[in-house]
């Protein structure tokens, strides 16, 4: 089995967003550098649904950039790559599908000590367990 966050990273790279894990895409940590990053983290979801073998998992995306415009633009680019109410089923990889829905749209989260801007949004992803 693969990891949901890695599979979402693979999907984003294929969509032209980000280049590689540990370069500008990260999981579960916000590194000090580079300045521009996309960070995916999983937090508490809901248990497996009876009869379908899938769980409603929760994923947070944090985008950091040097400017408000860049952070907002990148955040919305990631959001739009993952969220489409008319086509909610995403094939992240050949072996991983997910039904993606937004818990909220991208919003400014904070400005860090280096004056970099962070935007955040949260998703629900119904997908088989890892």
Describe every region a protein language model picked out.
Residues 53-71, 78, 115-127:
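Oligomerization/assembly interface segments of phage tail-like spikes and tubes
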Residues 68-74, 90-95:
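Short C-terminal domain-edge/linker segments immediately following a structured domain
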Residues 18, 83-130:
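Acidic-leaning, charged glycine-interspersed low-complexity segments
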Residues 69-70, 76-84, 105:
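Surface-exposed, low-hydrophobicity beta-strand/loop segments enriched in small/polar/acidic residues
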Residues 1-51, 85-95:
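Small/polar-rich, solvent-exposed N-terminal microdomains that initiate assembly or binding
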Residues 31, 52, 110-114:
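Sterically constrained small-residue positions within well-ordered secondary structures
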């Amino acid at each position: 089995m693969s990891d949901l966050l890695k599979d979402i990273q693979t999907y984003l790279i294929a969509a032209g967003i980000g280049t590689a894990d540990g370069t500008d895409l990260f999981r579960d940590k916000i590194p000090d550098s580079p300045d521009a990053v996309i960070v995916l983290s999983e937090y508490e979801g809901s248990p497996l649904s009876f009869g379908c073998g899938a769980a409603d998992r929760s994923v947070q995306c944090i985008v950091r950039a040097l400017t408000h415009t860049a952070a907002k633009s990148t955040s919305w680019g990631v959001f739009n790559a993952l969220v489409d109410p008319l086509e909610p089923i995403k094939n992240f990889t050949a072996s991983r599908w997910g039904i993606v829905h937004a818990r909220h749209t991208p919003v400014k989260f904070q400005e860090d000590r280096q004056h970099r801007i962070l935007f955040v949004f949260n998703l629900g992803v119904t997908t088989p367990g890892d």
